[in-house]
């Protein structure tokens, strides 16, 4: 077999010229963002309290009139908490709210058959976690409660899927 000569052509890399030398993150911008978050920290308590009150109001409306609109409002309130509670330094509220979202969103009937007692248990757990100011994600009692709620939701969803 004869050897064939190969020429390798390396085109010039002009990406660096186009992008520039940039040093990555602007540490001053990061410090300003951290300072802004710290300034808002005092307001976090008010915001999460308002969000939990909205959840409780939506839950009461659903208990009074269990229709899909009220269930949708309950879901949206739980979804807001799921997304914001960790920022507000209440990761267990986020965890329980996530479980509530799962129950009201993933059921085959859109959550209509979710047991009222399980809905109430989620809302009550969120209110207690906030009232007791449980911010530690490893709090023994709250993690046991969150785990049990998640387990009950899994059981509910399995039953719903089997129908």
Place the predicted regions along the sequence by residue.
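N-terminal leader/targeting peptides and immediately adjacent processing regions
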Residues: 1-43
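Structural secondary-structure packing elements that flank or coincide with functional cores
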Residues: 2-19, 122-161
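Long, amphipathic alpha-helical coiled-coil segments characteristic
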Residues: 29-72
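A contiguous, mid-protein "functional segment" used to position or interact
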Residues: 31-36, 44-46, 58, 110-141
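Generic structural signal for well-ordered, non-transmembrane alpha-helical segments
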Residues: 46-49, 53, 72, 79, ...
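Secondary-structure edge/capping motif, primarily at the C-terminal ends of alpha-helices
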Residues: 55-66, 85, 104-111, 133
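Short, charged, amphipathic alpha-helical segments
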Residues: 68, 72-76, 98, 113-120, ...
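Extended, amphipathic alpha-helices with heptad-repeat/coiled-coil or helix-bundle character
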Residues: 68-107
């Amino acid at each position: 077999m004869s050897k064939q000569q190969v020429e390798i052509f390396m085109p010039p890399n002009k990406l660096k010229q186009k992008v520039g030398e940039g040093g990555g993150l602007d540490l001053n911008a990061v410090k300003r963002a951290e300072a802004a978050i710290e300034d808002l920290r005092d307001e976090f308590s008010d915001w999460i309290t308002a969000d939990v009150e909205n959840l409780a109001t939506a839950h009461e409306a659903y208990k009074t009139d269990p229709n899909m609109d009220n269930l949708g409002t309950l879901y949206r309130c739980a979804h807001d908490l799921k997304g914001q509670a960790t920022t507000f330094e209440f990761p267990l509220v986020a965890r329980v709210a996530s479980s509530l979202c799962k129950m009201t969103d993933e059921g085959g009937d859109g959550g209509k058959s979710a047991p009222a007692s399980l809905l109430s248990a989620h809302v009550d757990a969120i209110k207690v976690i906030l009232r007791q100011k449980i911010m530690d994600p490893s709090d023994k009692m709250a993690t046991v409660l969150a785990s049990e709620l998640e387990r009950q939701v899994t059981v509910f969803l399995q039953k719903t899927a089997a129908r």
